[in-house]
């Protein structure tokens, strides 16, 4: 091939490449002009046709909470409603809210230019919600009327440009956000507790005029008794203290002399086994102190004793929640559930005269190895079910929580560990329903390696590390307390919360403080403005720690750290965002 033919071929190839580049540039420019036109049209429509008067501006949830409004509760109820009307608002679109990553743009041509398909809107709001989670102001700043719709518009069209300017492979990598790794827990500083932990356990906020009610009666396992019953919003385990305020007439007629009254408390949240759906599980409680409140109510302190089960057919009347000032009595037959405990396998091996070496610390390991050599059981199996090894591992895990009241009785220890190790709700139900102490301890042992967080129950924002729990009461890190209105709060004490996790409501106060010498201040989830607990700050100079937090069990849940991703918001948050936008655009 000569030089002239070669140059002619190269010239033709160069012209082809120029034509392809020109066509690509024209197509790219057309896409950009189309997106810009849609953006400008929607912006003009919002500004010219849909601008609400200033008095209809979005309100700050924190401000609403401070005014005593019920907006957060309304948001929760609204979020629990069905979305079908919202999803079907644009019949010409086949893209639902459940497919935010769809790349089908065919509907964009059929819809008016200022209308955006729901899946595009959902994707933009989802991204904004995830970004607001880690910023100051949280959802309150996100709902700022001055720039809310503008930010939604910008997010929608920035995502649209990203889809149109990249290839299919690159777009897939761009749209799919990598999962955030679990948050690394900051190093825990040493905690110095200069506070009498007996005071919260005594519930001294009730006053000093309470009188002792003697008598602690354990009922025979398997026996059936007729007693007064109430309901409770939290799960109580035997050994826990339940303080409450109630009309004294509910108990006085049934108070048998000097013996403490025993009554039953059922837990509606305790899901019964599938084969026993018509049963209510709970505990017996015995009153051990009482005193007048001065407002027609009586303070009572009671302690949970034994697990019980109630058949629905045996309930006489309508049971009421003990924390909601019940006005009528309800009685039922209750059955006392058993607690089975089997000693360690090696304890059943009779070593004769050598048994004296078992209690000598220097000979204990040698004695154990000799025992193992006389049995057919592998050493790993014996170690797996060793009660002593579970106790030691639990002691090491709780060492940083400043707890020195671990019981020695296996039955009491199994319930005590459930309260202080903070298991998930599913695990708590499993441990409560089992009659075997050994099985309960094995379930608890399976959670020793879990890294857990406290999450807001309403929006799933992470609030605190479970490893930051510590005991401000001799009963442990989780205790039931009663507020002045009679509502019972399950409170978990932590010495710190995550940055940008909380806001405040109202003013601090020292009245009816559960921790004498500390003032309390209501804290809210900074993302959804729901009440999640209290901040306690020392008002006396000699108390330590100076600041700690109490998380309300009804407002938080416990989950694994791996759940804490950037897109872990509750669906109702995004759904309500979409409804707000839709209302503004109608």
Swiss-Prot record:
Which GO cellular component terms, listed alphabetically, does the Swiss-Prot or TrEMBL entry include? nucleus
Which ranges carry the Lon N-terminal domain? 226-452
Reported modifications of this chain: Ubiquitinated.
Q: Where does Zn(2+) bind?
A: 456, 459, 525, 528
Pathway it acts in? Protein modification; protein ubiquitination
Q: Which cysteines are joined by disulfide bonds?
A: none
The record's subcellular locations are: Nucleus
Q: Name one GO biological process term.
A: positive regulation of neuromuscular synaptic transmission
Cite the record's Pro residues compositional bias ranges: 180-190
The residue ranges flagged as biased composition, category Acidic residues, are: 75-85, 170-179
Bias type Basic and acidic residues, positions: 14-37, 159-168
Q: Which Gene3D superfamilies match?
A: 1.20.58.1480, Peptide methionine sulfoxide reductase
Matching entries from InterPro entries are given as: CULT, Lon_prtase_N, Yippee/Mis18/Cereblon
One Gene Ontology molecular-function label: metal ion binding
Task: Outline what the protein does.
Answer: Substrate recognition component of a DCX (DDB1-CUL4-X-box) E3 protein ligase complex that mediates the ubiquitination and subsequent proteasomal degradation of target proteins. Has an essential role in mediating growth by negatively regulating insulin signaling. It also has a role in maintaining presynaptic function in the neuromuscular junction synapses of third-instar larvae.
Can you name this protein?
Protein cereblon
Gene transcribed to yield this protein: ohgt
């Amino acid at each position: 091939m000569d030089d002239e033919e070669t140059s002619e071929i190269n010239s033709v190839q160069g012209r082809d490449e120029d034509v392809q580049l020109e066509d690509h540039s024209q197509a790219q420019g057309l896409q950009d002009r189309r997106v810009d036109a849609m953006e400008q049209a929607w912006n003009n429509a919002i500004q010219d046709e849909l601008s609400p008067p200033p008095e209809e501006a979005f309100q700050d949830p924190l401000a609403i909470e401070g005014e005593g409004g019920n907006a957060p509760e309304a948001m929760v109820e609204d979020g629990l409603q069905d979305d079908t009307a919202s999803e079907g608002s644009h019949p010409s679109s086949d893209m639902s809210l459940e497919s935010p990553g769809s790349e089908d743009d065919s509907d964009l041509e059929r819809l008016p230019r200022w209308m955006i398909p729901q899946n595009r809107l959902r994707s933009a709001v989802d991204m904004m919600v995830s970004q607001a989670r880690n910023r100051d102001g949280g959802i309150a700043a996100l709902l700022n009327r001055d720039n809310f719709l503008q930010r939604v518009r910008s997010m929608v069209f920035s995502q649209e440009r990203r889809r149109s300017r990249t290839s299919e492979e690159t777009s897939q990598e761009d749209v799919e956000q990598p999962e955030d790794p679990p948050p690394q827990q900051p190093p825990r500083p040493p905690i110095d507790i200069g506070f009498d932990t007996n005071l919260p356990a005594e519930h001294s906020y009730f006053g000093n005029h309470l009188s002792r009610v003697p008598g602690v009666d354990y009922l025979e396992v398997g026996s059936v008794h007729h007693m007064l019953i109430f309901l409770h919003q939290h799960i109580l385990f035997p050994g826990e203290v339940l303080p409450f305020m109630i009309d004294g007439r509910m108990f006085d007629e049934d108070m048998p002399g000097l013996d403490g009254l025993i009554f039953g408390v059922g837990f509606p949240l305790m899901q019964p086994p599938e084969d026993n759906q018509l049963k209510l599980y709970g505990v017996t409680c015995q009153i051990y102190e009482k005193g007048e409140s001065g407002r027609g109510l009586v303070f009572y302190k009671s302690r949970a004793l034994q697990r019980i089960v109630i058949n629905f057919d045996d309930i006489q009347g309508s049971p009421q929640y003990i924390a909601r000032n019940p006005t009528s009595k309800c009685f039922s037959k209750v059955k006392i559930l058993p607690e089975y405990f089997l000693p360690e396998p090696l304890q059943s091996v009779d070593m004769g005269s050598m048994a004296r070496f078992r209690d000598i610390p220097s000979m204990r390991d040698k004695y154990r190895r000799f025992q193992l050599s006389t049995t057919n059981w592998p050493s790993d199996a014996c170690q797996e079910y060793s009660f002593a090894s579970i106790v030691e591992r639990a002691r090491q895990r709780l060492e940083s929580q400043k707890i020195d009241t671990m019981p020695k009785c296996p039955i009491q220890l199994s319930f005590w560990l459930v309260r202080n190790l903070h298991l998930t709700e599913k695990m708590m139900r499993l441990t409560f329903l089992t009659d075997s102490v050994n099985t309960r301890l094995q379930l608890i042992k399976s959670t020793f390696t879990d890294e857990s967080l406290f999450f807001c129950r309403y929006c799933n924002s992470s609030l605190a590390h479970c490893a930051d729990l510590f005991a401000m009461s001799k009963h442990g890190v989780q205790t039931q307390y009663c507020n002045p209105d009679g509502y019972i709060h399950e409170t978990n004490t932590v010495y710190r919360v995550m940055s940008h996790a909380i806001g405040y409501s109202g003013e601090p106060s020292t009245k009816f403080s559960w921790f004498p010498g500390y003032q309390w201040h209501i804290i809210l989830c900074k993302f959804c403005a729901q009440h999640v607990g209290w901040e306690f700050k020392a008002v006396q100079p000699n108390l330590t720690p100076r600041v700690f937090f109490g998380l309300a069990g009804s407002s938080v849940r416990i989950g694994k750290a791996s759940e804490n991703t950037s897109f872990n918001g509750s669906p109702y948050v995004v759904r309500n965002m979409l409804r707000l936008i839709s209302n503004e655009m109608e």
